[in-house]
């Protein structure tokens, strides 16, 4: 079941890729993908290229994929291990969701962080109290880690 669904999603992604994202299997392993997300232009991540790993569980799509940033990113909802705090990857997951929708949600999280549900409270605090410092730091991390 899972491999059939994953294959269908891969075909759909290749046919109609989400804006500024791409994804596909690593080597021949259909259950392990790598995705690339371009930093949204209207965010401090603009110009950055972020690598994201995707691991599908054997019971996908009934369980969510494990998605993590491989590129360091300064963000209240993404920690230093690359873990992402995103409701659709946890309790809001539904089998109707696709990797394409997950990637789009991650892109919008880059544009609009959710400081009220942070994974990194210090960054969330900075985002709320000193937006300029947050944006400067996020921009410098993007230049340092996500621009080749």
Swiss-Prot record:
* Active site residues according to the UniProt entry: 85
Q: Which GO terms describe its biological process?
A: protein polyubiquitination; ubiquitin-dependent protein catabolic process
Question: One MF term in GO for this entry?
Answer: ATP binding
Metabolic or biological pathway: Protein modification; protein ubiquitination
EC identifiers of the protein: 2.3.2.23
Q: Where is the UBC core domain?
A: 1-147
The record's annotation in InterPro entries points to: UBQ-conjugat_E2_core, UBQ-conjugating_AS, UBQ-conjugating_enzyme/RWD
Q: Which GO terms describe its cellular component?
A: nucleus
Pfam family, any one: UQ_con
Alphabetical UniProt keywords: ATP-binding, Nucleotide-binding, Transferase, Ubl conjugation pathway
The chemistry this enzyme catalyses reads: S-ubiquitinyl-[E1 ubiquitin-activating enzyme]-L-cysteine + [E2 ubiquitin-conjugating enzyme]-L-cysteine = [E1 ubiquitin-activating enzyme]-L-cysteine + S-ubiquitinyl-[E2 ubiquitin-conjugating enzyme]-L-cysteine
Q: Record keywords: Transferase included?
A: yes
Q: What does this protein do?
A: Catalyzes the covalent attachment of ubiquitin to other proteins. Mediates the selective degradation of short-lived and abnormal proteins.
Family indicated by similarity: Belongs to the ubiquitin-conjugating enzyme family.
Name the record gives this protein? Ubiquitin-conjugating enzyme E2-17 kDa
What taxonomic classification does the UniProt entry list for its organism?
A: Eukaryota, Viridiplantae, Streptophyta, Embryophyta, Tracheophyta
